[in-house]
Amino acid sequence: MKLSLMAAISKNGVIGNGPDIPWSAKGEQLLFKAITYNQWLLVGRKTFESMGALPNRKYAVVTRSSFTSSDENVLVFPSIDEALNHLKTITDHVIVSGGGEIYKSLIDKVDTLHISTIDIEPEGDVYFPEIPSSFRPVFSQDFVSNINYSYQIWQKG
């Protein structure tokens, strides 16, 4: 099973402030919507609760709480390992989509990073882990918006 990771990261490494993303760069979320369309997303409970279930996506939500969901497109797991073990029986690709603890736990296990770097330095309390030296950028595109950003694809190896 291929594991990809998608994140929007500010210049100072912030990815969240409590349950919120501390910016709104017009157009950047369209990248997320396009890349994750019809895909399985692996997320933590807090991230899932802040983003909600987007249409045409399936979710594996990892939580230590008693969180449940009646949505047929949402599966809940008590650990990342249990989620991955189940997902590999039903799909060949999963996109790790946050939050901070999930990113930190899986960044060394993913094959591809989809990173939007947002040209802002907000306050926040959730940070993206350092990108391992085993990754190399293979694509980059800059976008001019209300808050400028760049989108990069990084591959392991």
UniProtKB/Swiss-Prot annotation:
Gene3D superfamilies: Dihydrofolate Reductase, subunit A. The keyword Plastid does not apply. NCBIfam families: trim_DfrA1_like. Transmembrane segments: none annotated. GO terms for biological process: dihydrofolate metabolic process; folic acid metabolic process; one-carbon metabolic process; response to antibiotic; response to methotrexate; tetrahydrofolate biosynthetic process. The gene is dhfrXV. It catalyses: (6S)-5,6,7,8-tetrahydrofolate + NADP(+) = 7,8-dihydrofolate + NADPH + H(+). Key enzyme in folate metabolism. Catalyzes an essential reaction for de novo glycine and purine synthesis, and for DNA precursor synthesis. Belongs to the dihydrofolate reductase family. Homodimer. This is Dihydrofolate reductase type 15. PROSITE patterns: DHFR_1, DHFR_2. Residues 2-156 form the DHFR domain. InterPro entries: DHFR, DHFR-like_dom_sf, DHFR_CS, DHFR_dom. GO terms for molecular function: dihydrofolate reductase activity; NADP binding. Pathway: Cofactor biosynthesis; tetrahydrofolate biosynthesis; 5,6,7,8-tetrahydrofolate from 7,8-dihydrofolate: step 1/1. It comes from the Bacteria. The keyword NADP applies. PANTHER family: DIHYDROFOLATE REDUCTASE. Keywords: Antibiotic resistance, Methotrexate resistance, NADP, One-carbon metabolism, Oxidoreductase, Trimethoprim resistance. Its EC number is 1.5.1.3. CDD domains: DHFR (cd00209). The lineage of its organism: Bacteria, Pseudomonadati, Pseudomonadota, Gammaproteobacteria, Enterobacterales.
